[in-house]
């Protein structure tokens, strides 16, 4: 193709993303678009076709962003190249959403016509506005008996400030409205900007590791072109490679001769070093270099931390390799080596939330065959010493002694909860029990309210969301953003087994809740630790003060069974000997903590 033909081709490219609150039918609607445009053969079509992980299908959620090229002939006979980027809906994966939006000019905002606008819908709208995207609202699931289109259109106008008359009607189940959606993408979303004659600038928005091809970055070409044989340079790592293959996703890889401005695809260059490819980096030409990199992404900081330890200690290196490979297409994951007296060698790992933590653990188990034990999740605390020094603590066992601490600050979040009006009391009671401060209550309509709370982040990482869902019969939706750090009355609580501190069970608790937490943990451990030949005390302690205790009674062997007759002195002698033996066992005995005890403790909090 000559330059003029490439410029004409660029005018027919449309890059769009699909954003929605979790479970609003986003992946199903994407399936219908792919089916209608003939992108996927009906014979190989399956539900959630863009959700490539088994884990995504099982849970019915999207975890990773996915890109696919669609060819569409519009009603005016013109052929268009569309790049659809499917995104996750869960709050933990909003980073994946922001990455995909940076590769687009427009977005379909999917709203469930039976549920209306939810907390994550709002968050996604703000993200799209920040990225200057054209928003096309789509009311999905209109075939449901409970769908209320006029009411949701009113919400679009009042809550989002968008024109309700421009909202489209669709059903991912039946395929209703797919033609209208495609036509609106063509007319309302602008073609990508970019100059084919400028030096190459390509934004890396994702990457993964292929055992044959090495590291494969997913890219959006902004300026210039790239083809097989080109020498390219990664601007952040300064590493140079020769391109082996370029192509697009359909959703499998399709090899192309070149990629030009507006194209969304992939390149391979036999990259073996995982550290050379960073999401958000810019690829340029080695021979005709761009002066400046593209604006990447706001780096997401991990907010929930826990220790991950291999159940089989000889699998430590496999766990390390697993985390390195997962970090390739999940740049928000961070980890560093750590060791525990109770669990051996492992990694302190940072996540964007509890679901993110759960998904990573499951992927390590499925994709790499390593079973892991996770310690209790915690957040980053700001600890100020009496000398005025500031420490960042993400591991309770690293907290200095009480005498050295002047104050501790913990992160708070601004929570947005949307629920039916009848559940206001239950939501407020739950939030107050979690040390929340009510900020605002706003009625969206006569039945639904939006409640804003200020909550300590450490409180919501333990079962807050699950309790919220069960109290509101699943009708509440929840979104949050990190606010600032505030001073709190926090202390380190140690758990002792047989008089020894188990470092993996230490946690930081608020003074007012220390007794209940300690009592609950001791009771759980008593239930899950098997009996030994000696008595085991389980204690919860704040410093030197024991605040809760449970005792696992010793198993008793009947040492008098072999006696017959009535020789009471012999009986006493044997029982005395057993008593001495148990005393010795108690001082020398080690208590093994089973993995199910760890999991049960996480569930109690």
UniProtKB/Swiss-Prot annotation:
It catalyses: GTP + H2O = GDP + phosphate + H(+). It is a peripheral membrane protein. GO terms for cellular component: plasma membrane. The keyword Cell wall biogenesis/degradation does not apply. It holds the Pfam family EFG_C. It comes from the Bacteria. PROSITE patterns: G_TR_1, G_TR_2. Residues 11-193 form the tr-type G domain. GTP binds at residues 23-28, 140-143. It is found in: Cell membrane. The keyword Manganese does not apply. InterPro entries: EF-4, EFG_III/V, EFG_V-like, EFTu-like_2, G_TR_CS, LepA_C_sf, LepA_CTD, LepA_IV. Gene3D superfamilies: 3.30.70.240, Elongation factor 4, C-terminal domain, Elongation Factor G (Translational Gtpase), domain 3, P-loop containing nucleotide triphosphate hydrolases, Translation factors. One of its GO terms (biological process) is positive regulation of translation. One of its GO terms (molecular function) is GTPase activity. PANTHER family: TRANSLATION FACTOR GUF1 HOMOLOG, CHLOROPLASTIC, TRANSLATION FACTOR GUF1-RELATED. HAMAP family: LepA. Belongs to the TRAFAC class translation factor GTPase superfamily. Classic translation factor GTPase family. LepA subfamily. This is Elongation factor 4. It comes from Aster yellows witches'-broom phytoplasma (strain AYWB). The gene is lepA.
């Amino acid at each position: 193709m000559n330059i003029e033909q490439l410029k004409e081709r660029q005018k027919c490219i449309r890059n769009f993303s699909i954003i929605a609150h979790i479970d609003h039918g986003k992946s199903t609607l994407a399936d219908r678009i792919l089916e209608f445009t003939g992108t996927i053969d009906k014979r190989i079509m399956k539900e959630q076709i863009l959700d490539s992980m088994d884990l995504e299908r099982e849970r019915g959620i999207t975890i990773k962003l996915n890109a696919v090229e669609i060819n569409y002939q519009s009603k005016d006979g013109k052929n268009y190249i569309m790049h659809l980027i499917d995104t996750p809906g869960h709050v933990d994966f909003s980073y994946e959403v922001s990455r995909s939006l940076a590769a687009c000019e427009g977005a379909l905002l999917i709203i469930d016509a039976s549920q209306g606008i939810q907390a994550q819908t709002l968050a996604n709208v703000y993200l799209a506005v920040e990225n200057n995207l054209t928003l096309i609202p789509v009311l999905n699931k209109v075939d449901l008996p409970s769908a209320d289109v006029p009411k949701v259109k009113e919400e679009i106008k009042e809550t989002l400030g968008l024109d309700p008359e421009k909202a489209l009607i669709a059903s991912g189940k039946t395929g209703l409205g797919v033609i209208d959606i495609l036509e609106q993408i063509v007319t309302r979303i602008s073609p990508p900007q970019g100059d084919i004659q400028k030096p190459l600038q390509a934004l890396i928005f994702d990457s993964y590791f292929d055992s044959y091809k090495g590291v494969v970055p997913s890219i959006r070409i902004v300026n210039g072109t790239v083809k097989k044989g080109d020498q390219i340079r990664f601007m952040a790592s300064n590493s140079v490679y020769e391109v082996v293959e370029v192509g697009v996703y359909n959703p499998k890889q399709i090899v192309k001769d070149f990629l030009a401005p507006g194209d969304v695809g992939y390149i391979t260059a036999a990259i073996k070093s995982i550290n050379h490819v960073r999401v958000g980096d810019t690829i340029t030409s080695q021979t005709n270099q761009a002066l400046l990199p593209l604006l990447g992404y706001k780096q997401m900081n991990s907010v929930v931390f826990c220790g991950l330890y291999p159940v089989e200690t000889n699998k430590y290196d496999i766990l390390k390799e697993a985390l390195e490979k997962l970090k390739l297409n999940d740049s928000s994951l961070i980890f560093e080596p750590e060791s525990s007296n109770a669990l051996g060698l492992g990694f302190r790992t940072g996540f964007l939330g509890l679901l993110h933590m759960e998904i990573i653990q499951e992927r390590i188990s499925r994709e790499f065959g390593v079973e892991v034990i996770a310690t209790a999740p915690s957040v980053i605390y700001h600890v100020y010493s009496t000398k005025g020094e500031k420490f960042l603590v993400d591991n309770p066992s690293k907290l200095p002694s009480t005498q050295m601490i002047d104050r501790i600050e913990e992160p708070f979040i601004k929570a947005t909860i949307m629920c039916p009006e009848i559940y206001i009391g239950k939501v407020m009671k739950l939030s107050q029990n979690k040390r929340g401060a009510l900020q605002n209550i706003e009625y969206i309509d006569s039945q639904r309210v939006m409640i804003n709370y200020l909550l300590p982040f450490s409180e919501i990482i333990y079962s807050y969301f699950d309790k919220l869902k069960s109290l509101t019969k699943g009708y509440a939706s929840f979104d949050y953003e990190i606010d600032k750090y505030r001073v709190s009355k926090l202390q380190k609580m140690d758990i002792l087994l047989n008089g020894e501190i188990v470092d993996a069970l230490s946690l930081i608790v608020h003074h007012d809740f220390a007794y209940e937490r300690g009592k609950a943990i001791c009771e759980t451990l008593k239930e899950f630790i098997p009996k030994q030949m000696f008595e085991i005390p389980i204690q919860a302690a704040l410093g030197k003060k024991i605040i809760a205790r449970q005792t696992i009674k010793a198993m008793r062997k009947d040492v008098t069974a072999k006696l017959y007759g009535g020789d009471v002195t012999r009986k006493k002698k044997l029982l005395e000997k057993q008593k001495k033996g148990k005393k010795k066992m108690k001082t020398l005995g080690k208590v093994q903590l089973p993995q199910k005890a760890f999991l049960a403790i996480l569930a109690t909090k």
